[in-house]
Amino acid sequence: MLLTGCTDGRPKAADPAISLERRMREAAVRDSARLLERYDSTAAAHPALAGRLAPLRAAVAAHVSALSPAVPGAPSPSPSASPSGGTGAAAPAASGEPVPAKPEEALTALADAERSLSEARTIDLAGAPAELARMLASVAACGAVHVYLLTSTPGAKP
């Protein structure tokens, strides 16, 4: 006697934890990509800040890659992308907000964006699956360090 298994032809329901994680990762990637664009806009508007911003920008690009859901063949952002030189005038940031004309104010605006995103990620920890929560915590901590670096005077003693 031969027994065969049958299904009713309907697709299996998606694992809600997996879809929650995927949605959270996709939102985190979008947020980091917007922050990455702000770094690019700020460096383009203030070329003298580009060197100071480069390592922070590279870290944000790494966050985009690390948070991205595994999609075969998907390109990742370049951590070494260099924006074109600007005139120092206010340039529109990717978020639609202009980059402030003064370098100090541009750094403050970038620090505010980092702070807001770091705080949002900290809040998201409560609902995230364990592995993603650990990653969000790490990225949020990195954002807090970026806030410090963006608002401190280079070379000054603490």
For each feature predicted by the language model, list its residue ranges.
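All-alpha RGS (Regulator of G-protein Signaling) helical domain and cognate RGS-like helical scaffolds
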Residues: 2-158
